[in-house]
Amino acid sequence: MVLPKALGLASICLAVGVAACNPQISGDFYSGDVVDVLETDKPVIVPMRLGMPIQNEKKCEEHKNKMLPALERNSNNVKFLNCEDVQGNMYDLVNVEIDAETVKGMDVGDGQISGMFGARVAKDETNRAEIIFVKTPKAAKAIKEIDALYQFQSIELKGIEIKIRLNNDLRQAAQFVAGSSYVDGRPIDREASFELKRRAFIEVVPSNVRSQSLIANGQSLFGVLLLD
């Protein structure tokens, strides 16, 4: 059965499942940034793409005007990209670019991340560099502000879809340890190590469990970087 997007986002989410209407985050992460943050204690800023589900991209200007002010108040360097007609799905997207900070620290209170999303990196007891994704309270604040502008539907942050391309821009090879994720389209249950030669990259999509941890706990392990 094909459902028209005009049914509205709330009906769409109910019809096809909540996960289908989650915000989407994608972008590039660099092993060199992990090393820089660990060595200098200074944050590194990288642009990330944030896709916010909407009912219909044909009403782009209306959705853009509702969402952008809240995102600008709670994120850094917000740039509107486009409204995307997501073929084959019951929703479309407002795509924006936001700055995401990578800071040094292992605990939730370590390192100041000023936007909605970011990452913390720290060496564990075996000297491995853990990469932890972070959702700050500003994410919930932005969603609440956007929700207040929609009269007949609820905008809630119940899940999030993440897709990251991890690039090795170092002069030497590195190992990335991932678990509970899809790596280059392959489902990885237990921890597995992937070699990243110089200038190589892999695409990592964390599982729903890790995404839900990010929503519920404000943080989720992305993976571990081992350097030669």
Predicted regions and their residues:
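C-terminal motif of bacterial Sec signal peptides marking the signal peptidase cleavage site
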Residues: 17-20
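Mature, soluble, non-transmembrane domains
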Residues: 70-228
